[in-house]
Amino acid sequence: MFKENTTMMMDSNPPLFDQYEFLLQSTAHLQPFNNGNLPTNSVMEECQLPLIDLKGLKSSDEKERVACRREIFEASEEWGFFQVINHGIHTELLNRMNKEQIKLFGVPFEKKFTSGILDNSYRWGTPTATHPNQFSWSEAFHIPLTKVSEAACYGDFIYLREVMEEVASAMSKVARKLAGVLVESMGQRKELLEDICDESTCFLRLNHYPICPFSGEVSGLVPHTDSDFLTILHQDSGGGLQVMKGSQWLAVKPNPQALVVNIGDLLQVNTPTPISFHPIIYHSLFFQFPYYLIY
């Protein structure tokens, strides 16, 4: 996990504390809010998501290719989440992306909020929250892939553009590979992806979860399902991701060498895949970047 200048990050963080305090005060007279069995930071069972070696998809042995595709489909059905290794994205590139994220989120809050950087995609907290339990303690940039190569989006962050272009290209290859397997498992033509997927349906999101003084009470992201087709996530060693399997919340053991894959709502409509609610719960300050395929 990359270390950072704590003072610098405090100056650059959005006013999450003020907004959360306002919600606490404005709802103090209300009954406790029930947001569907919220998880907590208390000790819970740690799980290892299904770990799939994608080199099996490229094997010269047909049985190994079939077995790998079956693993992907079965993990999608049973968990809605799985991890992949040998995905083709070098650790060095992931580390460079993480370092650039730290630089980006270290920019003063007012500049992030008003400069229009990364297609004016900066957002923080939860503007629609009416209760503290609905509030996400995080900030993010949510960039359409159609904008990733536009120099005007980056301002002074010239090197960030180079890294993001590499990450977007690499993530696209992994996403298409996995989406192809899942589409075929649904009995559809693999070529269907070419008809329904292009850069306009894909996003790269950079997330930052600042240190939270209410870490026992608030999530980095509130429990949710992803309303897309497929999400591919890389997080650092800080951990914090939790998923619901059945009626139980499980802490996902971080694996910096792996990518986490989440089957989104749009795919679950067409499969018996379980609904996998997941929040981000604080264990430490950390960064992540998901890649979204949205159809």
What does each model-found stretch correspond to?
Residues 1-295:
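Peripheral, non-catalytic segments flanking oxidoreductase cores
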